[in-house]
């Protein structure tokens, strides 16, 4: 990535930039949105007259460390942004005393059924309970929660309601007080400011 003037250039894993400003969420929106079969940001926006900057998406990953130590990760990012897995890998590696070997997105049904209970894939919110991790799982029994800078200042936003077919309006939700690590885990993109 580089600026038009040529005064700044960086690869996507190192680029630091400021995303566009979010569009404020309207005041008269219901607390719960019924969102059947609306599992993507585009589906939710198109069906509910929303903008992606008003949504926080939650992506789950599994961090696999040496000695088969596995940590589930909740990565939260604004709906118009994308997680940069290299930045996320580097941030997680700094958090733990073990050597991070692999970071993979959790999407396959077998992994979910083996390790998670009552897990609403496609409808996950930032307040997902640690009890969704099965006692029989080899995973650490607590989600490591990470939020990108682009989403950490949103005080009112839409995210998964932690139940199938529902999204929720979060108001006055403070990531600073919820055991979240705030960091840069997003891809820089055209139109960002430096």
Stretches found by the model and what they are:
Residues 1-194:
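Extended, low-hydrophobicity, polar/charged segments
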């Amino acid at each position: 990535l580089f600026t038009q003037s040529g005064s700044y250039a960086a690869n996507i894993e190192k680029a630091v930039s400021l995303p566009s400003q979010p569009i404020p969420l309207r005041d008269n929106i219901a607390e719960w949105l019924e969102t059947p079969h609306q599992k993507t940001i585009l589906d939710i926006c198109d069906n509910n007259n929303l903008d992606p900057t008003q949504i926080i998406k939650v992506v789950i990953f599994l961090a696999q460390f040496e000695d088969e130590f596995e940590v589930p990760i909740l990565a939260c990012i604004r709906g118009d942004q994308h997680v940069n897995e290299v930045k996320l890998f580097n941030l997680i590696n700094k958090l733990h005393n073990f050597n991070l070997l692999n970071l993979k997105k959790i999407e396959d049904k077998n992994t979910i059924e083996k390790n998670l209970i009552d897990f609403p894939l496609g409808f996950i919110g930032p307040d997902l309970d640690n009890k969704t991790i099965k006692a029989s799982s080899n995973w650490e029994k607590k989600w490591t929660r990470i939020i990108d800078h682009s989403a950490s200042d949103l005080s009112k936003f839409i995210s998964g309601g932690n139940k199938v077919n529902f999204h929720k309006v979060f108001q006055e939700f403070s990531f600073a007080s919820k055991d979240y690590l705030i960091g840069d885990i997003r891809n820089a993109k055209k139109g960002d400011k430096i």
